[in-house]
Amino acid sequence: MQLSSVYLFYYLYLKMEKFVVFGRYCQDAIFKREPFREQHLNRLKNLKDRDILVTLGPTKCTKYLFGIFNANDVNELKDLIEEDIYWEKGIWINYDIYPWIQAF
């Protein structure tokens, strides 16, 4: 990667905002998600590799999801969430997005 590309990457990364996502899984999500899990996890890895996804996963009770994302704005993040197979297949049934300021 050329030096100018590295600077551009960090400029764009620092320009992105951070967002917290809280959502809810459907009933029996552990079983219903199985046919789509590999596709979902591959997509998340891609988002992580592109520094869009910081972290994402279910709560211990598996009723809720929690995630931290980098995005240019709320609409971009909504599109990312709704393009996920879990949203398309009804595994995730709702979500809320909150702009987040990382203190440290």
For the regions a protein language model found, what residue spans apply to each?
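Conserved, structured core segments of small domains
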Residues: 16-104
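Short, Lys/Arg-enriched N-terminal segments with co-localized hydrophobic residues
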Residues: 1-15
